[in-house]
Curated annotation (Swiss-Prot):
Major localization class: cytoplasm
Family to which this protein belongs: Belongs to the SNU71 family.
Example GO molecular function: RNA binding
Organism: Candida albicans (strain SC5314 / ATCC MYA-2876) (Yeast)
This protein's encoding gene: SNU71
GO cellular component, one term: spliceosomal complex
Chain intervals with Low complexity compositional bias: 503-520
Location relative to the cell: Cytoplasm; Nucleus
This protein's name: U1 small nuclear ribonucleoprotein component SNU71
Segments forming a coiled coil: 301-327, 450-479
Keyword RNA-binding listed: yes
Length: 614
């Protein structure tokens, strides 16, 4: 055992403070009648190995013993408070020279007068006046002690209280609501100018009209209210509550560094694995282990400080953001009040001008302020007028350009029609060389495939097209007739031309000669359609019409190719947006390379759909 004596030491299982504030109480007690406290005698020690750290166990024992002692004191305090309630005359609110610290143990009792903050919402004007705020109240003071402190201040006055305490608020806001106005007046007369002497840095916030109301009120009970004298006894009790650190709870808000604190606490029992130091000489291991622990602790401390700075910066940013929002709301409310006042003045109602509390308006008198408001309103009206005028001018220019383009297209109608006829002839020639007849001779299988697709498409769509065209003719027959009359054109000619067009669209073209005859016999209807087509501007169409037009383009491409070709859809859209319905033949020429003769039928169907739709 002698060899192991050097590795064993003796420690106390716990280490309590031997004073427990007895010296302080003995000084405060004028009679020096403080009861002696039985001090725990630690006449034994426990042997342990020096390599074992038992500091955490000793602290745990100390906490348990302290908790048991506090519970005993709380139970005694509750019993004494019950006796105090049964005998109210024993309350120490008098000015005699009794024991100053008498009844301090009574401060631990249940909260009875606390209510939630939403219940303090004022329901009438008197509730607004009787509710006050104690600002910058000490943070983390226990709630039961807050109530006991308020009771000391109120001196048996009836009240309820609540508070706001948030992690972004440095100090508490205590809300107090009195039952009667005379209690409020007594409290303000007694403590309004002296509250900071009892509780440091504390201020009382009241309604702006409370002093005026209390002074002008003719109630006899309010006139008899007199302030009370603040006694030394009361000051001593409040100082003991405020300055005792036991009366404060630990902050519950997260600091953001709890994980680092836990790691640092674990370093007291941290051990380095010897397998990691197998290459290090034994005489250097101890110093290296200490260096490792010191280095890691140092890095954790640096990270902890950095994280604290970041959290504090975020807190400041959040605080500033809330302040900016509050200022914005305040300015908006001020602007709305000013606007309402101006509107009432415009109607003819005589109102007293409301002077703004902003710094830039403080040096104005009533007349100057009215002139300032009138100038501001005039500037707003001028701005609105300029915006409306600019919008009108833009719309006027756009409409002028649209009508100018329409006039030019009508003036050049005949030359455009001749050019289109030449393109139609060229298209017919290409159809003779590259159409179905050519496929019928050289590639009969492709001819059958394309012909079957086209026939099925024509059979399903032709009937719908004819039906839609006939309905459009019935609906717009009177309007078309009047238009023809104004332009010195016979209505019968137009009707016969449209009927011929409808008849030829149902029949399947059997030869190129039939197509040529149709073009010759329908020159006048084509001219009318061209006029309508030149009036359509694709970009100016409503969104719903554009959507249906896009669906129609996708449908026609799928029917022609059997698949949805994004490239062809893009080509058609670009042509329509760039030229509207003016370059029909150009679009046909672009699509012929992919669709052959189906390109013309696709474009014709698309043009007919656009004209009927618009």
């Amino acid at each position: 055992m002698t060899a192991g004596d050097n590795s064993i030491e003796y420690v106390n299982p716990y280490s309590l403070s031997q004073t427990i504030n007895s010296d302080l109480i003995s000084i405060l007690d004028p009679n020096g009648s403080t009861t002696s406290i039985i001090k725990p005698q630690l006449n034994y020690q426990i042997p342990i190995f020096k390599s074992i750290d038992v500091s955490n166990l000793i602290d745990l024992n100390n906490t348990k013993i302290q908790t048991q002692t506090n519970e005993t004191r709380i139970n005694k305090a509750k019993d004494s408070s019950d006796d105090h309630q049964n005998n109210p005359s024993s309350k120490d609110y008098d000015t005699s020279g009794e024991n100053i610290v008498g009844g301090i143990d009574d401060i631990v009792e249940d909260i009875k007068l606390y209510v939630s903050i939403d219940k303090l919402k004022p329901e009438n004007f008197q509730n607004q006046l009787t509710t006050i705020i104690i600002n910058q109240f000490p943070t983390n003071l226990k709630s039961n002690l807050i109530e006991q402190l308020l009771k000391m201040l109120m001196n048996l006055k009836k009240f309820v209280w609540s508070f706001i305490n948030h992690e972004l608020i440095d100090l508490k806001l205590i809300f107090i609501k009195f039952d009667q106005l005379k209690d409020l007046k007594w409290f303000l007369l007694t403590y309004c100018d002296h509250i900071s002497q009892l509780i440091p840095n504390v201020t009382i916030i009241t309604n702006d009209k409370v002093n005026e109301y209390l002074n002008n009120n003719k109630d006899s009970s309010l006139a008899k209210v007199e302030p009370s004298k603040i006694t030394d006894n009361l000051k001593a009790k409040i100082n003991l509550i405020i300055n005792n650190p036991i009366n404060y709870t630990k902050g519950k808000k997260n600091s953001g560094t709890e994980d680092l604190d836990q790691v640092l606490d674990s370093y007291s029992n941290y051990k380095v694995d010897n397998n990691d130091l197998i290459d290090i000489p034994n005489n250097m291991k101890e110093n290296i282990i200490k260096d490792i622990i010191r280095f890691r602790s140092r890095m954790l401390l640096i990270e902890k400080e950095q994280r604290k700075k970041e959290i504090e910066m975020e807190r400041i940013k959040t605080k500033n953001k809330l302040k900016e929002l509050f200022e914005g709301i305040k300015e908006n409310s001020t602007d709305s009040t000013t606007r309402k006042a101006t509107n009432k003045a415009a109607v003819g109602v005589t109102i007293s001008p409301k002077v703004s509390h902003r710094d830039e308006y403080e040096d104005m008198n009533d007349k100057e302020y009215e002139e300032f408001i009138a100038v501001e309103e005039r500037n707003k009206l001028n701005d609105q007028y300029n915006k409306k005028l600019k919008s009108f001018q833009n719309n006027q220019h756009a409409e002028y350009m649209k009508l100018t383009n329409k006039l030019k297209s009508l003036q050049n109608y005949e030359s455009d029609l001749i050019d289109n006829k030449l393109k139609y002839i060229d298209n017919l020639k290409n159809y003779q060389t590259n159409g179905l007849a050519h496929l019928y001779t050289h590639n009969y299988s492709d001819y059958l495939r394309m012909r079957s697709q086209k026939r099925s498409l024509e059979e399903t769509k032709d009937a719908e097209d004819v039906k839609q065209e006939l309905e459009e003719i019935k609906k717009n027959g009177g309007q078309v007739a009047s238009t023809n009359t104004n332009t010195n054109t016979k209505p019968s000619t137009y009707s016969s031309g449209v009927s011929e067009l409808a008849t030829t669209s149902v029949e399947t073209p059997k030869s190129t000669t039939t197509t040529t005859t149709t073009n010759d016999t329908t020159d006048e209807p084509v001219a009318k359609k061209s006029k309508l087509a030149k009036e359509i501007i694709i970009i100016d169409l409503p969104p719903t019409v554009k959507q249906s037009l896009q669906e129609k383009i996708v449908e026609l491409v799928e029917n022609s190719l059997g698949i949805k070709d994004e490239f062809l859809i893009q080509v058609i859209n670009e042509n329509l947006e760039a030229s509207n319905l003016d370059n029909k033949q150009e679009l046909i020429d672009e699509l012929v390379q992919v669709l052959d003769e189906d390109a013309e039928s696709l474009v014709n169907e698309l043009w007919d759909y656009i004209e009927t739709m618009v």
